[in-house]
Amino acid sequence: MKPPILIIIMFTMISGTMMVLMSSHWLTTWIGFEMNMLAMVPILMKKFNPRTVEASTKYFLTQATASMIMMLSITVNLLLTGQWTVLNMNNQITSNMMTIALAMKLGLSPFHFWVPEVTQGVSLTSGVILLTWQKIAPLSVLYQISPSINSDLLTTMAMMSILIGAWGGLNQTQLRKILAYSSISHMGWMITMTTYNPTLMMLNLMIYILMTFVTFTLFAYSKSTTTLSLSHTWNKSPLIASLIMALMLSLGGLPPLSGFIPKWMIIQELTKNDMIIMPTLMAMMALLNLYFYMRLMYSTALTMFPSTNNIKMKWQFENSKKPILLPPLIVTSTMLLPLTPMMAILY
């Protein structure tokens, strides 16, 4: 893709998300979603081949269906209330329809089937945009309409997402699919907070975006897309392999890494609301997530395949490009735990 075209597409995508974030009118919110979706399709097809075409078609059909349900919800809400205001969605039917539309856009269960397939079919750079930036707009709308959302519907979808995200990633060997199921699971954790503490949901989103972005960057830097290719990383760069292992544990929510903060605060918030069974099940599912992350660690560090090369360090295969922003991002995505008391005061 030519740079001027790519710049226009990226600008359109960012503008669409910003329009959703700053809008208090349903029509401009919907237009923002459409701009975002139409800009994302060519980004997914950046490397033009049958797999990317299939992935972008699946993405387009799912997002178009979600947009239709969203527009229907907005129209019915307009007929009932006579207002276009985003905050004014007090009818239960329109609220449920909007929740389903946003769940489809986010890839929440039972509308999650497109997420692993689309992520697997595109490049790592397109995948990181799909699993990070594309979550901001739907979650911001959920944040705004959180007082009128049916908590039972949302909690059911959240628990199903955590369950699917934990089980789905167990037998995977493709790194992009593992991160897609991880995304579904993390979305479930975020959505549980929508009706209890929406601000905590946004904190969780920021930490999730940070960790996922750094993980994708390290995979792209080491040119790893499967567990087999990940096992060769130690020979090429032990430092990158060590950082990948730390990020895997952080994504799994193991203390004292950054990924533990949102899980800890969410479980604490749920127990404050006299909920015991739900956080217990969530913690048990988090163990399954941690299991497949530790399997990736095992592939990275403890399995070194036989090599005909006498030199252990394959210095000639090292990547000459040095990402400048990577060190501070790695530090923040693994070492935020000391800031937890300040976050607890804010959220």
Swiss-Prot record:
GO terms for cellular component: mitochondrial inner membrane. GO terms for molecular function: NADH dehydrogenase (ubiquinone) activity. Its main location: mitochondrion. One of its GO terms (biological process) is mitochondrial electron transport, NADH to ubiquinone. Its EC number is 7.1.1.2. It is a multi-pass membrane protein. Disulfide bonds: none annotated. It catalyses: a ubiquinone + NADH + 5 H(+)(in) = a ubiquinol + NAD(+) + 4 H(+)(out). It is an enzyme of class 7 (translocase). Keywords: Electron transport, Membrane, Mitochondrion, Mitochondrion inner membrane, NAD, Respiratory chain, Translocase, Transmembrane, Transmembrane helix, Transport, Ubiquinone. Core subunit of respiratory chain NADH dehydrogenase (Complex I) which is composed of 45 different subunits. Interacts with TMEM242. Core subunit of the mitochondrial membrane respiratory chain NADH dehydrogenase (Complex I) which catalyzes electron transfer from NADH through the respiratory chain, using ubiquinone as an electron acceptor. Essential for the catalytic activity and assembly of complex I. This is NADH-ubiquinone oxidoreductase chain 2. It comes from Nasua nasua. The lineage of its organism: Eukaryota, Metazoa, Chordata, Craniata, Vertebrata.
